[in-house]
Every structure is written in structure tokens, then in C-alpha cells.
């Protein structure tokens, strides 16, 4: 493993938790998915929802941090055999993560500007409407 993959793993973990929270608020069980295999303790539906946002949230935050050298090799400790973000570097990562989640973009279906965190919840609610038959199909979120 390398530092970039370590950051991606961290970002994916945070994104999965954000998706799980959005699904719970929308009244859905995050453990019953349709793309990811349902397994005990695995939030399959959260992982399903996460797929729409993986590149636009997690990947983009990590690439930005690395490309702009806001996080460097010196920010990692590999004394345990794999690169771990040092305690002092966590605020840089979390600040970038929160900035991205709070960034407002146009939601194509709702036709209004929302923060990405709000879009996660909106997508969960759109999924509810689809499952209840109020929408003929589920439209995944895509940045245009």
C-alpha cells in the first residue's frame, strides 16, 4: 500500500458513513443493498449509494490534496508496515473533506443548488420515492 491508497481508503470510509447517515435519515435500512452483496455487518445500501459519489467526493479530495501538495509523504508514518496519516495531518485532510461536502452544486433533478452533503440525503429520498413507486426509475446523481 502507498500513501495515496491510504488516503483513498480513509475518504471511502468517511463517504460510506455519510451515505449510511443519509439513508437512515431518509428511513432506509443501510444494510439491505441492491448492487453490493448483503452480508452481516456490511452497509450494502450505503455502499451502493456511495458509488455515485466516489469520484466526485472521495477521489477528488484526495487528488486535490496530493496534487496541490497540501498532504505530502512527510504527513505519513509507516512504522506499522503501512502508511498512516500522522495525527498532525488529520486537520488538513478533514478540512478538505468538509469543504468538499459543503460545496454547493446544481442538482440536475431537483434543479437547485445544494451542498454535496444535502445531495446525499436528496438521493436517499429520491430512492425512497422510487421504491414506493412515486418515481418510475432512480436517477443516479451526476455532475454536469
Region roles according to the model:
Residues 1-144:
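N-terminal intrinsically disordered, cationic/polar leader segments
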Amino acid at each position: 500500500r502507498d500513501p495515496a491508497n491510504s488516503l483513498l481508503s480513509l475518504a471511502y470510509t468517511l463517504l460510506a458513513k455519510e451515505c449510511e447517515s443519509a439513508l437512515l435519515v431518509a428511513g432506509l435500512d443501510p444494510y439491505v443493498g441492491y448492487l453490493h452483496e448483503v452480508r452481516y455487518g456490511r452497509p450494502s445500501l450505503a455502499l451502493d449509494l456511495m458509488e455515485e459519489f466516489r469520484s466526485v467526493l472521495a477521489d477528488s479530495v484526495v487528488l486535490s490534496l496530493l496534487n496541490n501538495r497540501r498532504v505530502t509523504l512527510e504527513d505519513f508514518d509507516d512504522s506499522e508496515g503501512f502508511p498512516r496519516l500522522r495525527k498532525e495531518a488529520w486537520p488538513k485532510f478533514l478540512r478538505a473533506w468538509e469543504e468538499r461536502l459543503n460545496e454547493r452544486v446544481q442538482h440536475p433533478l431537483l434543479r437547485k443548488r445544494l451542498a454535496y452533503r444535502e445531495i446525499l440525503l436528496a438521493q436517499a429520498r429520491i430512492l425512497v420515492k422510487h421504491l414506493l413507486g412515486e418515481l418510475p426509475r432512480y436517477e443516479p446523481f451526476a455532475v454536469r
